[in-house]
From Swiss-Prot:
The keyword Repeat applies. It comes from the Eukaryota. Disulfide bonds: none annotated. Gene3D superfamilies: EF-hand, Pleckstrin-homology domain (PH domain)/Phosphotyrosine-binding domain (PTB), putative rabgap domain of human tbc1 domain family member 14 like domains, Ypt/Rab-GAP domain of gyp1p, domain 1, Ypt/Rab-GAP domain of gyp1p, domain 3. Residues 505-692 form the Rab-GAP TBC domain. Residues 145-212, 285-353 form the GRAM domain. May act as a GTPase-activating protein for Rab family protein(s). Residues 1031-1070 are annotated as: Disordered. The record marks R552 as: Arginine finger. GO terms for molecular function: GTPase activator activity. One of its GO terms (biological process) is positive regulation of cell population proliferation. It holds the Pfam family GRAM. This is TBC1 domain family member 8. It comes from Homo sapiens.
Amino acid sequence: MWLKPEEVLLKNALKLWVTQKSSCYFILQRRRGHGEGGGRLTGRLVGALDAVLDSNARVAPFRILLQVPGSQVYSPIACGATLEEINQHWDWLEQNLLHTLSVFDNKDDIASFVKGKVKALIAEETSSRLAEQEEEPEKFREALVKFEARFNFPEAEKLVTYYSCCCWKGRVPRQGWLYLSINHLCFYSFFLGKELKLVVPWVDIQKLERTSNVFLTDTIRITTQNKERDFSMFLNLDEVFKVMEQLADVTLRRLLDNEVFDLDPDLQEPSQITKRDLEARAQNEFFRAFFRLPRKEKLHAVVDCSLWTPFSRCHTTGRMFASDSYICFASREDGCCKIILPLREVVSIEKMEDTSLLPHPIIVSIRSKVAFQFIELRDRDSLVEALLARLKQVHANHPVHYDTSADDDMASLVFHSTSMCSDHRFGDLEMMSSQNSEESEKEKSPLMHPDALVTAFQQSGSQSPDSRMSREQIKISLWNDHFVEYGRTVCMFRTEKIRKLVAMGIPESLRGRLWLLFSDAVTDLASHPGYYGNLVEESLGKCCLVTEEIERDLHRSLPEHPAFQNETGIAALRRVLTAYAHRNPKIGYCQSMNILTSVLLLYTKEEEAFWLLVAVCERMLPDYFNHRVIGAQVDQSVFEELIKGHLPELAEHMNDLSALASVSLSWFLTLFLSIMPLESAVNVVDCFFYDGIKAIFQLGLAVLEANAEDLCSSKDDGQALMILSRFLDHIKNEDSPGPPVGSHHAFFSDDQEPYPVTDISDLIRDSYEKFGDQSVEQIEHLRYKHRIRVLQGHEDTTKQNVLRVVIPEVSILPEDLEELYDLFKREHMMSCYWEQPRPMASRHDPSRPYAEQYRIDARQFAHLFQLVSPWTCGAHTEILAERTFRLLDDNMDQLIEFKAFVSCLDIMYNGEMNEKIKLLYRLHIPPALTENDRDSQSPLRNPLLSTSRPLVFGKPNGDAVDYQKQLKQMIKDLAKEKDKTEKELPKMSQREFIQFCKTLYSMFHEDPEENDLYQAIATVTTLLLQIGEVGQRGSSSGSCSQECGEELRASAPSPEDSVFADTGKTPQDSQAFPEAAERDWTVSLEHILASLLTEQSLVNFFEKPLDMKSKLENAKINQYNLKTFEMSHQSQSELKLSNL
């Protein structure tokens, strides 16, 4: 590679470098000791010095120097790992610069010109290799060269970043370099002549954590299936851990969770991932989780600033977040103040004049005639310019038509109270295009229910109407006061005060609207007018597996509530669930969605319920609603760790917290709706829409804390489950205006003693007071940590189930079968790493049966066959692998699963001789052997085998053995014993038989009994050729049985004949085998097996025990080397073709 020119004195390097060639201005040198074998003492000393110091010259032992005539100062301008690489640079210099330099008179001009050219080349090379995105591109380029030379990965394996650190081997630290690439974690150490290389694929990492040991307080521990590795002594351990966490998460989800995982656009191409991309992704995910925004929202800028907060009459310090469609603000102090400004609501963004009190201010005005003042903004001009550009784009894509009549109507319906200003309507949130569009929408979807179901099916509570209304009015009054001070639209100030109001329970008349506000579903609703109605029409009447599942669960959704004892509620629920399944087929429909949607329909209109469901499924509970509920399982593991941290006594008593975590699955999936009375559970949903998943975590901890004493005294998991069920069933809501609606899993005790009742408001208040200290950032970090474990847990489950299915059907030892599965999966993964992107669904499909989830193609199978097959045939191995793949590919989809792969190996290693011969036989007839088979194409029309061999041979002791009688008797016996129920294999033609013999011949190569095997196969081949000729003549005359004996008796011994005739010579009677006659020549499996059984050496060869363990050990070592060699050879071939 090209180097940034730096001046050196050549006389100081005379002993270390040897000049290979030179010109007027350039010198090409080789590091002394490189390529000299074990020769000279000086070379060995320099090599030892480089090894001890881990010098760059060990990796790049060639360099080119710029020399200016008359100067003793030289400048290295290029280095290379090989002579070919450095010669390419030398040739470029000769062709492009050497003649140009001769026109310069001033030597300083020569140096400046060359250095400028080299720097331009470096910039171009840097741009192509993404190094310009690193903080120190020169050092990164050097590290990149070392990484490529030390680990010999294909070019597709891109280095992301590197760090100096120690890897602990027992109690001994090894100082070296940690290289983090897109698919692997690599460590290299070379000290005092001892080299250590460590390569760990990210997909093999089962645990990534920060730990402490006896020697060091802070280390990073990597846990794989078999080993633990500790890394320490980083300059910035926090940064390293975050990058490793991001890389592991991206790679694991890209390769193992492709069912629902969508990469950010910047990470779509793995080979383009850089450290900055990972940092941006982490910041993006925190931003979306903190403000609960759509997953496609991309963060553009984070700026420190201060916001004028009228309720506190001062400026509040914090940070502004600017994204595609939002301007958000969060105060430095957690919970103090937060705002979300959709750009759809923004009217203008203006710069104000700077003053000493208001430095660098801007004003953001929204449609409800409220302005937000930000000050102390760095780079204000560029920020405002970018915000205005995005504002213009949002308004162009989603024009807003404000309808005051609709707003007045909604404001009077929902908020019968005074407001901050006359135009500050809650109805702004609806953003209806116009009254005409609203009417046309109703005409378009006449079946859509116009109101929330709770208004049509209002129940009378046990309390008096006056008492119920008075409590509701008090809450409404408190909320109205809050709206006056903090705002009532989606752009309201969100403070600790509103959290307290939410914890008390939102009034029923405001509940649906505030859910829309807190989740920001109102923005989706306003941005997609008519979208839901179109979905309903498109999905109406369609029948599929998803609609059948929905129909099955419709009547299980809040059956106690009168709204869902009526076709009106059932029909609305059906439309919303079917429309969502039509919108998002990746999720489709999952159980528990029906319970959540039914509650949403109680308090919101049908279309609003749909957008709330979108918000919950796609951003508030990511990855919850899919076939494997990965997101819910991750949060269960997070919840388990939170129990250990906040309730240590309970965790100590219950050694296995997985039981509590499994009980909590329904808490997370249904937001407590399925295990708590409805009038209490809706208060939980209130908190969820305001605080997100944090509210569910802290409420779960509060439930366990309230029952900790009883749980500690419980004897088993069943009793603990009953304790929690009884407690949750007796949570009441004293402020609920409606009658109690029981939970789906109410617990009834035989005891007559009344169980104490817990008020939901008290429980929620306790959860905030005792467990409300968890931040979004902490929860996201825990999710990263546990997502690795959950995904690897799924992989382990898949592996165990595959082995459970396959073990009874094969004779391979379970531990060897496990090793084979790991090799099979690793082969699949390596193709995902370095080959061109292919549709992942055709490879790893979690919805398929366990044994068929990982599948490999013909090329991958050939690699594995070469590594683990006992039938090594030299150059013929690849051809045999192709035929084996075609045989195993029953459905002709060019993919095979693990079960088929193992069943084939089982026959090769553990099968009886007849099974092995049958497999070989099938490999040489269609479909395994095709007309286009590359090894079966021969320019000769005549057979390659002689058929004039005798049927009488001499034994070593001089006795003669007549095979005629034996052969005839064997054929008769086989005909009698043949299993009529088994499908008969087609007979083998002469061409196919020739290929069969070639395979046997190549299998015997380098065997200890090679000579005996060749003599035996010569005998067997002659027998079979004679049988084929007899059958051929018999078929032409119609009396095969009579002619068989005559033909055999007519055979004359001829010791000079060879089994494999010289292909360069054609027998004189070659014309006796025309094409038609060749087609008539056939032998059967029974003939081949009977003939092979006549030779003891062949029987011994096929029945000798084979060692699979040694093969597997070699395969584990060589699998990566074989793949990288093939990839590098392929890339070199492509390079040569491109040069041509």
